[in-house]
Amino acid sequence: MLDHSCQVQRHPHAERGLDLYETPSVAVEALLRVEQLPHSIWEPAAGRGAIVRVLRNHSHNVVASDVFDYGALDFVGDFLKQERMPVGCEAIVTNPPFMIAEPFVERALELAPLVIMLLRLAFLES
């Protein structure tokens, strides 16, 4: 007999304290199929670089930052305290920490001419 129950599992790359959930590459690939992104992009919640790798594989220049150095960053910094975009960047593409997604969206809209947030649909309910 088949078990059709739905089980929720914690993402294997989740880190509770910093709300790190790596974005599946298929999500970024899907984005690239429907959006024409500028060449230079800032990923301010880069984590270990999941989004960054896909964008760079598609020849985008990506500046990667995060509040914690996971080893794949151009600089460490708190996005919510940034006063300007990195030089040359024309867009923000990120999967922000869910617990502070709303302030991330607000800050990104203040800083960038183009903002793409990869968020769970549950964000729309909050």
Where are these regions (language model features)?
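Class I S-adenosyl-L-methionine-dependent methyltransferase catalytic core
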Residues: 1-126
